[in-house]
């Protein structure tokens, strides 16, 4: 799929939630996984890209997404919302279970084309953010880093924050880095163009 192909992003729905591969959709539609720590703005990112307010439920309670949520977009591709990581109030046992579920999907899923790894532009990446990026690089899974909540920082400081994040991640210059805001829609076109180019 290329950027030129028409994609009706408003024609989107949540398809199913899955705990393991036996529940995954059984077809060959390309998938884009979205990963990031709890409350990084993943649901807002999905809703903004799809032009819907409440398709992905935003929550004041981090760690609410406990399954892989598959979103069908115009019967041409799927977004897969991965459980938010790094939330302290979730038990170690639950975190380990989520970790195994996420790893199984990322490593074994043939449909997966690219992972959008979301980080918060305001803060240095956490150890969890760094581990996720290193994991994706180790398994040679294509990755796009999206730095969310850009509207919370003056535009003149974006480059400084971007540099800090890239340094902490040991960012591969061949990967894409997008500064994004679900409030101002900064990064919207770049995000879609970059995602579609990977399909």
Swiss-Prot record:
Entries under InterPro entries matching the protein: G_ENGB_dom (IPR030393), GTP-bd (IPR006073), GTP-bd_ribosome_bio_YsxC (IPR019987), P-loop_NTPase (IPR027417), Small_GTP-bd (IPR005225)
Segments crossing the lipid bilayer: none
Example GO biological process: division septum assembly
Domain of life: Bacteria
PANTHER family xrefs: ENGB-TYPE G DOMAIN-CONTAINING PROTEIN, MSS1/TRME-RELATED GTP-BINDING PROTEIN
A cellular-component GO term for this protein: cytosol
Binding site for Mg(2+): 43, 65
CDD domains referenced in this protein's UniProt entry, alphabetically: YihA_EngB
Gene name of the record: engB
Protein name listed in UniProt: Probable GTP-binding protein EngB
Domain EngB-type G: 28-199
Named cofactor requirement(s): Mg(2+)
């Amino acid at each position: 799929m290329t950027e030129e192909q028409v994609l009706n992003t408003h024609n989107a729905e949540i398809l199913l939630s899955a705990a393991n591969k036996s529940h995954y959709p059984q077809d060959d539609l390309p998938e884009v996984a979205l990963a990031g720590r709890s409350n990084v703005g993943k649901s807002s990112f999905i809703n903004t890209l799809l032009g819907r307010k409440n398709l992905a439920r935003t929550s004041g309670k981090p760690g609410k997404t406990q399954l892989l949520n598959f979103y069908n977009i115009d019967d041409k591709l799927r977004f897969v919302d991965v459980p938010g990581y790094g939330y302290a109030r979730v038990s170690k046992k639950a975190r380990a279970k989520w970790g195994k579920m996420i790893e199984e999907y990322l490593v074994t899923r043939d449909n997966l084309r690219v992972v959008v790894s979301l980080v918060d532009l305001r803060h240095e990446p956490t150890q969890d953010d760094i581990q996720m990026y290193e994991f994706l690089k180790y398994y040679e899974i294509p990755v796009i880093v999206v730095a969310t909540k850009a509207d919370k920082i003056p535009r003149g400081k974006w480059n400084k924050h971007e540099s800090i994040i890239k340094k902490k991640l040991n960012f591969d210059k061949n990967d894409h880095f997008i500064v994004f805001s679900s409030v101002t829609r900064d990064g919207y076109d770049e995000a879609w163009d970059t995602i579609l180019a990977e399909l």
